[in-house]
């Protein structure tokens, strides 16, 4: 067994010099600019719930971490904006302030209200170009007043030079440079202000790729590096009521995660006009974890019959908030135990 090292005079001098340096750093840059990890126990990560039980658990910390950059990307109409709007609604439920930078100029007020967003307490900007969008986002972040900012989308952050140029002008690399410069400036401010910054991104196909995945996201590589979490979202099988399509089963995969293990997956229903189906998630996860019993077409929880058929069971849970909360907590506990 190695003997415990006794501090020497030289060590004491070093510690004294370090103390003086840290005091100077804190005086210049503020309290908490530098800290000893051994002297300060790392607190649990503060989060904003995603609006999906399964995704909260796949993220490993119960939601989107505060003070971090999140990238949500996927094909068109896969549920990217829906996922981001649910996060805004969850932040507002906890008393937080939210803002959306609508670079696509396509924000749907009615749909956001249906998903639980208080639009009267939502700040929205519809900028003319990418520089303006990112400048607005940076100023909101530096105010430390906003809990969550959604930028929809990276592909729509068109550089000013491209907008003012002629059709067909070659502006190679402008978009990537804009994103790289903005993220270098914003990252530190996001961390200090504890703001969750969600970038929605689109997929493109690389030309001439014969082997491997030809898909790539827009805006260069900067966002891939600066994002603490990257979520790939895809729509799967349609949800039908007879012949009418009511929504889609949606699959998400956490491809990058700096706060918990990556590569976890989640599935949930996105119903048109309603967003993520919480009751559907409770049924599916409950059956998977043996919390809800399925016998033939009947679903039951303990002595409570939930209904015959998935839709009837969903309706029963949707109409009983107390039961929904109880099942949600049991599901969270079961998955935590599974991952521990």
Swiss-Prot record:
What cellular-component terms does GO give this entry?
cytosol
Q: Which GO terms describe its molecular function?
A: ATP binding; ATP hydrolysis activity; ATP-dependent DNA damage sensor activity; damaged DNA binding; single-stranded DNA binding
State the gene name recorded for this protein.
Answer: recA
Quick check: keyword Cell membrane in the entry? no
Family membership noted in the UniProt record:
Belongs to the RecA family.
Residues the record lists as binding ATP: 74-81
- State the organism of origin: Porphyromonas gingivalis (strain ATCC BAA-308 / W83)
Q: What is its subcellular localisation? A: Cytoplasm
- NCBIfam families hit by this protein: tigrfam_recA
Name-wise, this protein is Protein RecA
GO annotation, biological process: DNA recombination; DNA repair; SOS response
Protein purpose:
Can catalyze the hydrolysis of ATP in the presence of single-stranded DNA, the ATP-dependent uptake of single-stranded DNA by duplex DNA, and the ATP-dependent hybridization of homologous single-stranded DNAs. It interacts with LexA causing its activation and leading to its autocatalytic cleavage.
Q: Which domain of life is it from?
A: Bacteria
Per its UniProt record, what InterPro entries does this chain match? AAA+_ATPase (IPR003593), DNA_recomb/repair_RecA (IPR013765), DNA_recomb/repair_RecA_CS (IPR020584), P-loop_NTPase (IPR027417), RecA-like_C (IPR049261), RecA-like_N (IPR049428), RecA_ATP-bd (IPR020588), RecA_C_sf (IPR023400)
Q: Which Pfam families match?
A: RecA, RecA_C
Q: Which PANTHER family does the entry mention? A: MITOCHONDRIAL DNA REPAIR PROTEIN RECA HOMOLOG-RELATED, RECA
**Keyword set, alphabetical order:** ATP-binding, Cytoplasm, DNA damage, DNA recombination, DNA repair, DNA-binding, Nucleotide-binding, SOS response
